[in-house]
Amino acid sequence: MSDKQQQKHKQKARQARVKAQINRDKARRNLLRQREKLARRRTRNRKQSEPRRDDSDGDDTDGETVKNPAAHSTMPPQKSNAENAVRNSHSTVPKTPKYSDVTARERLYGQRLHQKTAGGNSEASAPSDESASGSPTEDEVNDE
């Protein structure tokens, strides 16, 4: 390969890495946004179902107590995302990707994920997140 071809190859490889980082960050923002929507939907559903549950008080339509043991959950009821964040507070994913020269983003799970989504909307925190990680912007990709 000539020097010109090598330079072109290196430039394309660099652009591919930058594009992959941008796509990763977009997917991450979308996941955080989806998580916020899911939390809002859960609270809305919980508000709708609690009055119905209080009205039934474990009785079926005939006034008899339901005796189905499969209908009882052994898991504690989910009251908030904070409770779930504490329950799922470990990760088996390595901190840095194997065989990769791309800088890894901070893993979001457990309390960090809850704080990230509860601390405000994901769009407001996303620009500061990207500048801290050193991930290039779309304009930087187009300049290369």
UniProtKB/Swiss-Prot annotation:
Residues 7-17, 26-46 have a biased composition (Basic residues). Disulfide bonds: none annotated. Disruption phenotype: A single deletion produces no gas vesicles, in situ. Deletion of gvpG1-gvpH1-gvpI1 prevents gas vesicle formation, cells still express gvpA1. A single deletion makes gas vesicles as long as the cell that sometime distort its shape. Complemention restores wild-type gas vesicles, in H.volcanii. Residues 122-136 have a biased composition (Low complexity). Residues 75-94 have a biased composition (Polar residues). Keywords: Gas vesicle, Plasmid. Encoded in a 14-gene plasmid locus called p-vac which produces predominantly short, spindle-shaped gas vesicles during all stages of growth. Belongs to the gas vesicle GvpI family. This is Gas vesicle protein I1. It comes from Halobacterium salinarum (strain ATCC 700922 / JCM 11081 / NRC-1) (Halobacterium halobium). The lineage of its organism: Archaea, Methanobacteriati, Methanobacteriota, Stenosarchaea group, Halobacteria.
